[in-house]
């Protein structure tokens, strides 16, 4: 049978059990393992056999104790087997007898299904079997089919209904077999009662034999008295009496044989009772002994688990002890450094009083720094504004310069045409005067000269004269505007130079103030750390030592944590370095852009100056020279700052690494020392609790000896910084 089919049969039998609607839990097979629901169902099936007195003996609270479950199931199984034997008249085969120990302890579904099958067999074979069969017919088809299969499986291996001597012997052996499984004395009383009943039957049969013998004597006497009658009647009576005597003798023989059998049976039962009593006593002793052994076994199992855990812990401790050799040497080095750091402690305590007085100065300097930052931001905004205006004016200036060049070219062309016209006009006037002198009549000659000059030329000359006047006026206005623009450009350059010088001075002041603030803060931190009283130092040291003691159980994790801590510090420092480098690159790009703008402005100013005054080509204005000097100073300062930044970066990395290694080396050394003191007791081999006490005392001594390590560490950190 497949496992799936078995599960379906179990579910169907559970559904059939739920139709009785008992008060006990019957929702799952786990609820049936206690036996309460099965006992209530049997009480519903046959209340006369499974009565209330029997039901009371079934323990109900068995959820936490599997032995009570097994006891209930044994009692129920014994009663069911007796019901099959005595009431139904046929015993149960060994294949259908469940193992109650597996049901109670492990909730075995297969054995529990056998138990429910026996209950089903009681239901379909009792006096109320029609009602139970009708109740089964009301269930679903799948449930009915599963119940019928269970019934067929139960009846397929059942013996015949006839009660033979073999079945009685088999039942007797089975009853003795299951009697050993029971721990109750009621079964023994039932067997004794049965023996008593058999003895009463034997006594009744003996009395009946005596009565028959008395009747036989009376019949013989009657025969002797009636011997005087007729021979035929006498013969008939004699035959009748002989037949009765034979029957009585046979009955007597049969009763005597049955009496002997019963006597022998009774003797055997007495011997069995004595043996069973003796065995019961032995089994009770064995049961108590087995219970004690089970308790001891549970204790030993618990202790074995604990021993395994302790062995693993000891192995881990051994591995940790192997890694603690370096820490001892580091603790010695730290103790040597502590003596050197203690000398500096007194000096730093004296400096603390001086630093307290400088806190007000630090606060005022920080406020000045904030004000200077605000001024710097406003000045930078003004510089950007002036720069934008300068750019617009520069574009306008370039446009005006182009327009000026175009006008100059047009002016030159107009000058040439004007010169030509003047020459032609002078030539005509000379010719006219010569003709006038020759002819002596000037008015006609003038009219002739006027007629010789074409009208278009006259119009062109007039127009050119007007344009010349306009261009002269426009040139004068452009010249004035150019002077204004040059003045404005010079003024903007002066303001720009002034703002740059102010910004540079402010930056220098800010850097100086920042350096002073950092120096004062560093002094305050150092002196504040030295000013802590001994109680705070002791408390901090105790906290650190407690942390080290906690790390005693997981040293490997701490080592991994140390390895992961150093990359974190490096990562933070690298992140800070990257940010500073980005800021530096951004400032360098800004400086380059400003330098390029300055160069462009200077080149344009140079071209303008050359175009305005071509004679002064080799002259360099002082503003341009000042800008060049400022750019050179900025380049040198940037290079100095870059070199200082690289030096401080390398120094900071070394300081962080030294601080981390010194701190964790100190912790590991303390831990190594405490573990060595625990693993090497002075008085030889001791118990585990004694070793723990020694370890605690050693740890307390280590705390008192390690109070000086923290000042050493802080002095080392300050010296490195």
From Swiss-Prot:
Main location group: cytoplasm
InterPro entries assigned: CH_dom (IPR001715), CH_dom_sf (IPR036872), Hook_C (IPR008636), HOOK_N (IPR043936)
Keywords: Coiled coil, Cytoplasm, Cytoskeleton, Microtubule, Protein transport, Transport
Pfam families the record matches: HOOK (PF05622), HOOK_N (PF19047)
SUPFAM superfamilies membership: Hook domain
This protein's GO CC annotations: centrosome; cytoplasm; FHF complex; microtubule
Coiled-coil regions, chain positions: 181-425, 484-659
Protein task: May function to promote vesicle trafficking and/or fusion. May contribute to the establishment and maintenance of centrosome function.
Family note: Belongs to the hook family.
Protein name per Swiss-Prot or TrEMBL: Protein Hook homolog 2
Organism in which the protein naturally occurs: Xenopus laevis
